[in-house]
């Protein structure tokens, strides 16, 4: 999980979702998991 000021999808399987007011990227690849804030 990376926490970044700006989150971007890395591959075509990355999905952007909102969870508890945070923008997150979830993906099949665990290295692509990101959270904003």
UniProtKB/Swiss-Prot annotation:
Keyword Ribosomal protein belongs to the record: yes
Molecular function (Gene Ontology), one example: structural constituent of ribosome
Transmembrane segments: none
Cross-referenced InterPro entries: Ribosomal_bL36, Ribosomal_bL36_sp
This protein's record includes keyword RNA-binding: no
PROSITE patterns cross-referenced by the UniProt entry: RIBOSOMAL_L36
Alphabetical GO biological process terms: translation
Cellular component annotations (GO), alphabetically ordered: cytoplasm; ribonucleoprotein complex; ribosome
Keywords from the named record: Ribonucleoprotein, Ribosomal protein
Similarity section: Belongs to the bacterial ribosomal protein bL36 family.
Protein name (database record): Large ribosomal subunit protein bL36
Organism field: Pelotomaculum thermopropionicum (strain DSM 13744 / JCM 10971 / SI)
């Amino acid at each position: 999980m990376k926490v970044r000021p700006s989150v971007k999808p890395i591959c075509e399987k990355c999905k952007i979702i909102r969870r508890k007011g945070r923008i997150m990227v979830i993906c099949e690849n665990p290295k692509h998991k990101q959270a904003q804030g």
